[in-house]
Amino acid sequence: MNIHEYQGKDILRKFGVAVPKGIVAFSPEEAKQAAIQLFEEQNSPVVVIKAQIHAGGRGKAGGVKLAKSPEEVFDIAQQMLGITLVTHQTGPEGKEVRRLLVEEGMNIDKEFYVGITLDRSTSQNVLMVSTEGGMEIEKVAEETPEKLLKIQVNPLFGLQAFQARQAAFFLELEGEQFKNTVKFITALYNAYTSIDAAIAEINPLVVTKEGRVLALDAKINFDSNALFRHKDFLELRDISEEDPFEVEASKSNLNYVRLDGNVGCMVNGAGLAMGTMDMIQLAGGRPANFLDVGGGASPQTVEEGFKIILSDKNVKAILVNIFGGIVRCDRVAGGIIEAAKKVDLHLPVIVRLEGTNASIAQKMLDESGLNLIAAKGLHDAAKKVHEALEPA
């Protein structure tokens, strides 16, 4: 689960992670009042107005501005609130700006990158630091790997003091800056593990000319599987930032990810779903989604799956690929037939069912009288998808 920058900073602050003073605003007047408060409390001659959306690259897209007076903050907030911000992470559709973070300005001396996430290849947490603050870390790792240090952290022992010092040495810091960075990294790791985060990314981490070490930006993503331990975090979810199709699918406990293709997929099992998407691509189509209805696919979940797929106007054909192991194929076929009767299935639907009671399911589909195209095997299904996409 993703959250906004200001929410992430509020959480980090509770764990002793140094962050700038900031106030969230939902209107130009609130932004102005926040600026008045910050100018009174801070020594900085400027404040920063930052658009709050679930995407990076805001600065280049005009989502981060400096202001020297409350009146200027008001004007910038008027211009920024309600606009659609398009960055390299939002896609061409962009995201609407509904809230702003008004934050104290920093007298920046140096910028770095610090991030913590799970390294699945080693089953350990990995602390990453780079001298290239403000840059995309993937680009740094690819083009200048010598500027990125990765430190494996055994979750049984946690981050050791020497590892935090190793990271600070890599950043070539000395004196108070060194001590403050070690303290910062230690606090960040504590926060990361305590809140069951999937990633805690500070980009950039700044060192001011006064020696302060702070998180100028913060990206915190939670492990959704651990949210039962942090039910208060559910209040931080901003559904308006999420794909509406994915939100609707989650209500029916469907694992759905929207893509930009033209073939809708309905599959049971993540591995089979990935293989199905590959076959669609090889057959000349492009998958429009990842949709895993789970091992216990019922008529209700199949119907909801069809509704969600058909909501995507880019879909030109649908491939249903079910292996009947936990769930019987005849039960799935019944769900497909019932869903087809309730939902306006105006698109070609290719159905491939294998496993328990597959022959019974095949007979049910053949006798349904509906426009359902049966496929024998995955290759045949991919071939029929290709044929369905070809212009008449």
From Swiss-Prot:
Catalytic reactions on record: succinate + ATP + CoA = succinyl-CoA + ADP + phosphate; GTP + succinate + CoA = succinyl-CoA + GDP + phosphate
Keywords, in A-Z order: ATP-binding, Ligase, Magnesium, Metal-binding, Nucleotide-binding, Tricarboxylic acid cycle
Annotated InterPro entries: ATP-grasp, ATP-grasp_succ-CoA_synth-type, ATP_grasp_subdomain_1, Succ-CoA_synthase_bsu_CS, SUCC_ACL_C, Succ_CoA_ligase-like_bsu, Succinyl-CoA_synth-like
Domain ATP-grasp positions: 9-248
UniProt cofactor note: Binds 1 Mg(2+) ion per subunit.
Cofactor: Mg(2+)
GO MF term set: ATP binding; magnesium ion binding; succinate-CoA ligase (ADP-forming) activity; succinate-CoA ligase (GDP-forming) activity
Binding site for substrate: N268, G325, I326, V327
Superkingdom assignment: Bacteria
One Pfam family from the record: Ligase_CoA
Matching SUPFAM superfamilies: Glutathione synthetase ATP-binding domain-like, Succinyl-CoA synthetase domains
EC numbers: 6.2.1.5
Residues where ATP binds: K50, G57, R58, G59, E103, M106, E111
UniProt pathway: Carbohydrate metabolism; tricarboxylic acid cycle; succinate from succinyl-CoA (ligase route): step 1/1
Function, in words: Succinyl-CoA synthetase functions in the citric acid cycle (TCA), coupling the hydrolysis of succinyl-CoA to the synthesis of either ATP or GTP and thus represents the only step of substrate-level phosphorylation in the TCA. The beta subunit provides nucleotide specificity of the enzyme and binds the substrate succinate, while the binding sites for coenzyme A and phosphate are found in the alpha subunit.
PANTHER family: SUCCINATE--COA LIGASE [GDP-FORMING] SUBUNIT BETA, MITOCHONDRIAL (PTHR11815:SF10), SUCCINYL-COA SYNTHETASE BETA CHAIN (PTHR11815)
Quaternary state and interactors: Heterotetramer of two alpha and two beta subunits.
The protein's name in its UniProt record: Succinate--CoA ligase [ADP-forming] subunit beta
Organism field: Chlorobium phaeobacteroides (strain DSM 266 / SMG 266 / 2430)
Gene encoding the protein: sucC
